């Protein structure tokens, strides 16, 4: 597997692919889809600013429709899924051109399609659980395409109205996982036990996600079918590629 970091404006991708010919394809995908989003925002500024689901025009680009659908499912604005959706489109386009193994991580939001199992390491800021837990995405899920997305109220620059160290959502589509992580994270308010319960209750209301893992400090909770949890360490979580994943 070839490792590559790609940075274009606000988009910072950690990419793993099985052939370097897919690197330029990924760059072109980022440029094209960013332009599609930006041009749509010029005509419909509310697409950028809305914190609630919005309808998009019938002739909107595919990525805009995907983001709007994810926002509708998770009850958030479309931009809540932008990072995961860009990763999803990078993987989708590479697979259409014959790529067998690809992992795209965009600010903690991962889309992947691989022939082997993948361990996604947990990073939850200052929580003692950071770097100690990984989630093993088995071959069946990985080979069909999968999304693992993380939202945090204590790490990074993304908007969250909650205080969770990590909301990790697992779903077939990274776009839905990303929007759902944001939506669930907004409920992480108050004492850890109460906040985690509120997050898990919200997660139960969202369709099309497999499960969620919530971290607040030393406390954690889960809902649904999350991948097998495995012990890991900083060496594995911080691979030579990036901070979040590695194939096994």
UniProtKB/Swiss-Prot annotation:
InterPro entries: ApbE-like_sf, MA1715-like, UPF0280. This is UPF0280 protein Maeo_0343. Belongs to the UPF0280 family. It comes from Methanococcus aeolicus (strain ATCC BAA-1280 / DSM 17508 / OCM 812 / Nankai-3). It comes from the Archaea. HAMAP family: UPF0280.
